[in-house]
């Protein structure tokens, strides 16, 4: 393979890698930005009290979010089945929480299916996040 073709191939790979990194950076967010997005999608204002009720209430699968994340999400939790430690959910205590849209969506999708038996709706996500953002 001639040198120029190899070099061109490397340039294409480098450009693709850079585009992927930039796309990942575009998913970075703040909890307030995610809250605004969920509220806009839901078409209603988020209510922290509804978020707390949803988080602590047992749902159809007999679990609550608080089963693993504790009723005080400023503290670390523990998965009830695996025993795996879970970092605090409150953004004020854990600066990594709710800073990546893709990761936030992944965990909402997985955990809501486990706890509620379905994906959470935008208004539920907004309410939960609004409540978590009130915790210091």
For each predicted feature, which ranges?
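C-terminal segment of classical bacterial N-terminal signal peptides
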Residues: 17-26
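Electrostatic cytochrome c docking/interface patches
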Residues: 29-59
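Short microdomains enriched in Cys/His and/or Lys/Arg
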Residues: 86-102
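Bacterial N-terminal signal peptides that target proteins for export
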Residues: 2-13
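C-terminal capping alpha-helices of c-type cytochrome domains
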Residues: 105-136
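Short cysteine/histidine-rich zinc-coordinating motifs and their immediately flanking basic loops
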Residues: 77-84
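The canonical Cys-X-X-Cys-His
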Residues: 60-72, 128
